[in-house]
Amino acid sequence: MIERVKGTRDFLPEEMVKRRWVFEKIREVFETYGFKEVLTPVMEYTKLFQLRSGEEVVKQLYAFKDKGGRDVALRPDMTSSVARLYVNSFQTAPKPIKWYYIANMFRYEEPQSGRYREFWQAGVELIGSDKIEADAEVIALFVDSYLSTGLKDFTVNIGDRVLLDEFAKMLGVKDDIGLMRIIDKKDKLSQEEFLKALGEFGLDENGIEKVLNLIEIKGKPDDVLPLAEELFTSERAKEEISRLYNLVDILSWYEVDEWIQIDLGIARGFDYYTSIVFEAIVPNDLGIGSIGGGGRYDNLIEVFGGKPTPATGFAIGIERLIPILEWKGLLPELKAGPDVFVIPVGDSRDVATAIVTRLRKAGIRSDIELSGRKLRKALDYANRIGVRLSIIVGKRDLERGVVTIRDLESGNQVEVPVDNVVTKVRELLNQ
């Protein structure tokens, strides 16, 4: 027997109906914000992801040579692919461009709670605006996307790469990206491992203490931003803190400030982020950390050969969100499969087929007996697959112009004229 590949999953109908519900809830919100759907190839040239994705992501690439000797990789995220799409074909398009996607990604990492080697994300990219209003629009959509699924007990933590860069300068660190990578891993490492990583990076005890103090500066904006003003003194940092104040004000206009906190220790794992970054956290007992995140990446498009173009976006981790929704009991009761099962008895398949066809054209999920089972076995099958109504099409009933509709939940049944089947089925399903 051939097993499925480690870190991947099969989704049965009962799981797919839940996933589709989540996808459609998020898709609906994306489109109400004016975003349009795109999809890029699952494979790109490996170089695309090596340029600015970050050391950790590059290590986890599913990369190989194709039969033509070209280096290709399965996408580990969509931002790089969408930026490549923009550079290829849309540099002269009206700005800002607002695109969204729902797609699968691949990373070779150790499977654990909420982490798989194939996983799905729903995200957006807003390309062509460097205004703080664009950041606010994207973060507000980030919040509303989670709210659309019924989730309310979450926090969106906002950090800033500019402030982390200034912090690195204050420590005398030249490799600011290296420091950010370590800070980004802080929640994945034990305290001992984190301190060891900072020491191996070259920080002395004083520097390590400053890092530990920095990552504790988090909370509501009114509490944190004044502390940031005390900590950072450079003009660049002051300008960025002013932008954060402005961002928080705009988010209050969107009526999402209830979910917003500032966390100066957020770095995010991709090297392409340039200023504001953010992630969503839900308190849970499942061992799941961030359920999504994003930020501004103003240099990525230029790195890929385009004209300098600002951009911002986010991705929601579907494999992390759905377990949270299930754990909190927020997914509705959803049924996969047909509501009606039509059973021809004897020489009545022509009428049975006509009935199931009318039901389907009326938008009623219907199936028909295809295996030649006798009535009792056909009813047993209908019960086992969870069908609500069974329509028994018998020759004697047809001589009187009727069929029998049996409610498999209550056991009640009723004779209905053939021409009235669709109306009666709708009535019974709505009871």
From Swiss-Prot:
<dbReference type="InterPro" id="IPR015807">
    <property type="entry name" value="His-tRNA-ligase"/>
</dbReference>
<dbReference type="Pfam" id="PF13393">
    <property type="entry name" value="tRNA-synt_His"/>
</dbReference>
<keyword id="KW-0648">Protein biosynthesis</keyword>
<dbReference type="GO" id="GO:0006427">
    <property type="term" value="P:histidyl-tRNA aminoacylation"/>
</dbReference>
<dbReference type="GO" id="GO:0005737">
    <property type="term" value="C:cytoplasm"/>
</dbReference>
<dbReference type="InterPro" id="IPR033656">
    <property type="entry name" value="HisRS_anticodon"/>
</dbReference>
<dbReference type="InterPro" id="IPR006195">
    <property type="entry name" value="aa-tRNA-synth_II"/>
</dbReference>
<protein>
    <recommendedName>
        <fullName>Histidine--tRNA ligase</fullName>
        <ecNumber>6.1.1.21</ecNumber>
    </recommendedName>
</protein>
<dbReference type="GO" id="GO:0005524">
    <property type="term" value="F:ATP binding"/>
</dbReference>
<dbReference type="GO" id="GO:0000105">
    <property type="term" value="P:L-histidine biosynthetic process"/>
</dbReference>
<dbReference type="InterPro" id="IPR041715">
    <property type="entry name" value="HisRS-like_core"/>
</dbReference>
<keyword id="KW-0547">Nucleotide-binding</keyword>
<dbReference type="GO" id="GO:0004821">
    <property type="term" value="F:histidine-tRNA ligase activity"/>
</dbReference>
<keyword id="KW-0067">ATP-binding</keyword>
<dbReference type="InterPro" id="IPR004516">
    <property type="entry name" value="HisRS/HisZ"/>
</dbReference>
<keyword id="KW-0963">Cytoplasm</keyword>
<dbReference type="Pfam" id="PF03129">
    <property type="entry name" value="HGTP_anticodon"/>
</dbReference>
<keyword id="KW-0030">Aminoacyl-tRNA synthetase</keyword>
<keyword id="KW-0436">Ligase</keyword>
<dbReference type="InterPro" id="IPR004517">
    <property type="entry name" value="HisZ"/>
</dbReference>
<dbReference type="InterPro" id="IPR036621">
    <property type="entry name" value="Anticodon-bd_dom_sf"/>
</dbReference>
<dbReference type="InterPro" id="IPR045864">
    <property type="entry name" value="aa-tRNA-synth_II/BPL/LPL"/>
</dbReference>
<dbReference type="InterPro" id="IPR004154">
    <property type="entry name" value="Anticodon-bd"/>
</dbReference>
<comment type="similarity">
    <text>Belongs to the class-II aminoacyl-tRNA synthetase family.</text>
</comment>
